[in-house]
């Protein structure tokens, strides 16, 4: 856990610059961010967001809220996915060739 800017792309870049090897990025609305240096695993617990943006999101955690899986089952699947990504499986952003979602000047405080 690091103190980074609130802008999605800038916060991911800050985490990676600080040494993060895999960014686990939680999103409610489905920000399709990625990075060229380290994988960005995007997860949501919003089932509407996952349904709409499943091509851009890597993990659907909404089953914790709506079932039928238990917290333990979801946690086990999440950890298997993290291990698979660490072993080379591409996250959605990498598979889509989506690396950074900022074009032009970004003012970050």
Predicted region positions:
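Non-transmembrane, aqueous-exposed alpha-helical and coiled segments at domain scale
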Residues: 1-8, 14-17, 54-57, 72-80, ...
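Hydrophobic alpha-helical bundle architecture
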Residues: 1-51, 63-67
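Extended hydrophobic packing segments that form well-structured cores
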Residues: 19-21, 26, 40, 61, ...
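Short, Lys/Arg-enriched charge-dense amphipathic segments
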Residues: 48-55, 96-98
């Amino acid at each position: 856990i690091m103190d980074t800017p609130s802008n999605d792309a800038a916060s991911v870049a800050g985490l990676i610059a600080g040494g993060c090897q895999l960014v686990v990025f939680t999103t409610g609305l489905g920000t399709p961010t990625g990075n060229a240096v380290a994988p960005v695993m995007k997860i949501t617990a919003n089932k509407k967001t996952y349904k709409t943006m499943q091509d851009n999101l890597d993990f659907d955690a909404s089953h914790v809220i709506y079932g039928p899986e238990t917290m333990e089952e979801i946690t086990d699947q999440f950890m298997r996915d993290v291990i698979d990504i660490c072993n080379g499986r591409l996250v959605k952003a990498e598979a889509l060739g989506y690396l950074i979602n900022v074009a032009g000047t970004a003012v970050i405080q």
